[in-house]
Amino acid sequence: MRARLDHMRSISRNDPRQYDDLADQWWHPGGGFEMLHWLAEARAALIPPAARPGAVLVDAGCGGGLMAPHVAGKGYRHVGVDLGRTGLRLAAQRGVEPVNGDVAALPLASGVADVVAAGEILEHVTDLPGTVAELSRVLRPGGLVVIDTVNDNALSRFITVTAGERLGFAPPGIHDASLFVRPRRLIAEFARHGVRLDVRGARPTLGGLLRWRLLRGRPTRGRIVPTGLTAVLYQGTGRKDRERS
């Protein structure tokens, strides 16, 4: 473990190779990606059952496919797009159709998706306008986009990077705080492509965080719950205008 952490510290922040180094953590109970499981469950709860046969859910930045068990019964063809091949292999084992690609240049046809989910990925992209344009492009008119990401301010940087890494809630170097995105900016970017995004704050339960910290390597049953404050973590949903192609 120490050798792996030393290697991660030797590469730049937000380097996608870190996810390959941490591949064994995707489905490790109580491991380094534990909170991503909570976020995936909360994200999936915002996705309604498929409204038509053959409906497509595009999971942008799917990682190891953590949303799969939470959307499996909703009637979607679950397509996961990610740069990390190791994570995609794990996602495929859980029923996700894997596509190796960049969320800023999705290798998918326009209007293919009934739902686009972009969870814990927007704070990692270096081209936010291009990424939002691509997420909107593959969404069919009337389709739903679901996001969660990290706000850009001093508090979010302290909690997510400084305290989060020090306390073991985030792998070292996994975030580059300069890429965090404010809700109003994200709302404006989606609006340019005919998607009206509504956002709300979200936070992990305190009990879940404490159990995760104290019971490393064991399931913690933590949850993400809504809050009125978007200062650190927030979720968003929006529909694409039916007139937009």
Could you describe each region identified by the protein language model?
Residues 11, 38-43, 127, 178-182, ...:
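Soluble or luminal CAZymes and related metallo-dependent hydrolases
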Residues 25-26, 153-156, 203-207:
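Feature marks short, surface-exposed loop/turn motifs that line or immediately flank catalytic pockets
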Residues 44-48, 55-157, 236-238:
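Conserved SAM-binding loop
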Residues 156-165, 210-216:
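Short, flexible, mixed-charge acidic loops at enzyme active sites
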Residues 188, 192, 196-245:
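A C-terminal cap/extension of S-adenosyl-L-methionine-dependent methyltransferases
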